[in-house]
Amino acid sequence: MDIIGGQHLRQMWDDLADVYGHKTALICESSGGVVNRYSYLELNQEINRTANLFYTLGIRKGDKVALHLDNCPEFIFCWFGLAKIGAIMVPINARLLREESTWILQNSQACLLVTSAQFYPMYQQIQQEDASQLRHICLIDMALPADDGVSSFTQLKNQQPATLCYAPPLSTDDTAEILFTSGTTSRPKGVVITHYNLRFAGYYSAWQCALRDDDVYLTVMPAFHIDCQCTAAMAAFSAGATFVLVEKYSARAFWGQVQKYRATITECIPMMIRTLMVQPPSANDRQHRLREVMFYLNLSEQEKDAFCERFGVRLLTSYGMTETIVGIIGDRPGDKRRWPSIGRAGFCYEAEIRDDHNRPLPAGELGEICIKGVPGKTIFKEYFLNPKATAKVLEADGWLHTGDTGYRDEEGFFYFVDRRCNMIKRGGENVSCVELENIIATHPKIQDIVVVGIKDSIRDEAIKAFVVLNEGETLSEEEFFCFCEQNMAKFKVPSYLEIRKDLPRNCSGKIIRKNLK
């Protein structure tokens, strides 16, 4: 069954420009407060100019182009400009340093890079000292003299015609993007995403939050992340809505931005909710038009209730990962919600809980969350040049092993427990890091928390807690361990405590646990 009607991304943008014309498609706000607005017609023209720019630089169908950018209009131009000529976008996490960025360049086979002045010095070093196929760099925010290896993106783009000059045959099965996973526990893998994947993601995510063309979807999630691309941008564009892309998240500025742009949909991660809650209460806290807040794991019930009560919002839970493209389990429009459930399987998907022998488990039994989709259509196609890793998680019949532990109830609601790799084995007992973190997060002095397992010669693993305190607070070990003993089983109480100023997180707010072990 072809849900997207055989339409690739080039056809999508040509149709959107025809249908929505002068309606606002994209608003970008920089950290300095500069705002750029584009109608659907104007945005399609900018995308065409960018596609023509890449063509003049020798980019052809199947070539890989890396983007190392913060949230900005140019990211959107490049993403869809590359897709229009059949080239492949390779977004690089803007927080990565030289070694990790070099690794992605080399393993993606990118031959051209689009970046900004902020990151350019690092890539000068990479070009000079590291082996890669990179032959050209475009800088989005610098006027440059002619140079064999570097060009001004803006100058070149503005010289291009607004109609597409190169339009090779495209298929919805063509690769549109290679998105490298966050690599919180190991080297990132290149997730291959097709035109079909992105088109489907737009329709699916628009369905999930009942998006209309009069909606305004605001996000502060990084554009190089799957959530921003598939849950927000593709959903907004597919519905003919307005997409607001804010360069960087600021707890102090967030509600003002929601109000200014009259946003009706936004998305949040736990880090955002916790930092918003420590802002001083304001009479404007409920002065917004938000209908839904798309939410991704994990939050305690106490934190959820406090946030919803203060800001007058409700959370629409969505569970997924880069490999699933969208939130394949989640709350549904018009359906009941059952916190702390992550929801039920969405349309076009099946979900099961399986044991260690890959056998389905009944309701109430703990096991691995497994999802069935269609590779290259409703879930990722494969890991780039890594068939062994692909075979490890993706079965031939489309069942994807998520590596997450959970269970389901009799009505088909699923419950996330933890990443399997985050389960601590302590003296014969399995302890969920997330469970402990949700309990410890309710301590009034604690702003942020993560627990990890560390080697223990007697009990397999001991539990260590890393906490960040609220400003001006102090916390003794005695007070901390007493709190834990009163709120969790004895075998779950951490053995060690370390108080830190911050915790290492990736772009989507996930703790980088390998940096703490």
Curated annotation (Swiss-Prot):
Pathway: Amine and polyamine metabolism; carnitine metabolism
A Pfam family it matches: AMP-binding
Gene3D superfamilies referenced in this protein's UniProt entry, alphabetically: 3.30.300.30, N-terminal domain of ligase-like
Membrane-spanning ranges: none
A biological-process GO annotation: carnitine metabolic process
Catalysis: reaction(s): 4-(trimethylamino)butanoate + ATP + CoA = 4-(trimethylamino)butanoyl-CoA + AMP + diphosphate; crotonobetaine + ATP + CoA = crotonobetainyl-CoA + AMP + diphosphate; (R)-carnitine + ATP + CoA = (R)-carnitinyl-CoA + AMP + diphosphate
Family that this chain belongs to: Belongs to the ATP-dependent AMP-binding enzyme family.
Matching PANTHER family: ACYL-COA SYNTHETASE, MEDIUM-CHAIN ACYL-COA LIGASE ACSF2, MITOCHONDRIAL
The protein, known as: Crotonobetaine/carnitine--CoA ligase
